[in-house]
Amino acid sequence: MNATQNIEHNFLNTTPMIAANHFTGERMFKKAYMLDGIYEGKLLDEPLPRTDTVRNTSREYAMAKLKEAGITTDKKIIVYAPTWKGQLYNSLDYDLTELKDAVKTLRSNINTDEYEVFLRVHYFIYRAILMDEEMSKICIPFTVDTDELLSVVDILISDYSSIFFDFLGTGRPILFYVPDLKDYTENRGLYIPMEEMPGPVSENLEDIAGYINNIEEIKKEYKPKYDAMYEWCCQKEDGGVSDRVIDAVFLGKEDETMNCKNDKTKLLFMADWTRPFVNQVGLTKLFNKINYDKYDVTLLTGKPKKKEQSKALEKLDPRVRILVNNKRLNATWSEKNKIFRGIRARKTSIEEAAEIFRRGNEWQRLVGDSKFDELIMVRPKSAPLNWLVLSYVAPIKKKSLVVTETVRESAYELPEMVAHFDEISDNLDKIQRYKK
């Protein structure tokens, strides 16, 4: 969850976006990131413009670029392009010795009179490889564009890297070497089951070498899967993608888009999961009973500060879309003081506080142009007043507030702070209309 908590906000504030292919559009954007039903922008049904480079780059040009970078060969080119496996941007889990041994194992088990093996690594470890004299000779530098490189690659070996999508359009064989499949799946997850891959998958390099030695048979065996994914992902990769995207984005011409809308009633729950007394148990039970055939549900919550808070969110019904408010209010110190202290001191009205939120585009920062039919706020006693101001500026017609008795008394000490709610109740169990 922490790895993607900014991404949804970025997507919701972006239009147009490029789907890249049907897999990315359907499985990643619409399902994995749950944009289906909430994204109001345009999701262009186009490949990435960079695929034009794979299609349009001449072999002579690409080989000249490689020669300039110190890479020369008259053999068939195999590129091993493992994905980066660091958990953080400044953390690397790669064992360079392991990487070097992998290349040696491949070379010792294939016909090196026919093939040359090169590396294309993530730039996070490229500098480390340059310190190794032997490895630096076979590592493709970044002066050679990845898609220019792919235009002349004969066999690609990868794992979970999205590089294979760019290569898929060439029709050339792809092999998947996945020595850490279980760990990677548990820590980062896979969008495509390995059994659907357009090439053989193995945890053993000797197997990969065997596939290379029998590559024509492998191509025949995996042709149905390759063709199926090609049909799904590469149909529109015709070398003219850039022109169509420029026309759609900058010239306003109509282009095919993927539909992200549904007819469900859109519910937005505002409940800061990190605050005590938020009634997590009651909310979890409610989410388990909602009629998801009728309702599209989003939970806007605070950034988890403890592991148990993250785990509690992960246990919610998977159909609940979670948006995390993980940044502080976009306001100056004096403006924040005007909100948090001024309201309680009766010196700042809710409308004055709301104006600060509007100037900072606080609502749009969190949900973009998303439209909701109902807002349900669950507010514990310790919740800061800025959540009430946020609910005030929300462009949603129907608003409900659920509070405990003690909080209700506290809230009514500031009656104008809750006057914008159409309904106030003191128990989540009273919310019956959303249940199956």
Segments from the language model and where they lie:
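Short acidic-hydrophobic, aromatic-tinged amphipathic segments that line or gate anion-handling sites
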Residues: K137-T143, M197-Y211, I322-N326, E423-D426
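A nucleotide-sugar donor-handling region in carbohydrate enzymes
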Residues: T4-L88, E221-M229, E237, S242-D243, ...
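Short, charged/polar "capping" segments at the starts of alpha-helices
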Residues: G25-K30, T53-V54, L88, F124-M131, ...
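Conserved catalytic-core segment of nucleotide-activated headgroup transferases in glycan assembly
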Residues: L48-I129, N204, R275, N279-K289, ...
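Active-site and donor-binding regions of nucleotide-sugar-utilizing enzymes
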Residues: M1-N56, E308-Q309, L329-H420
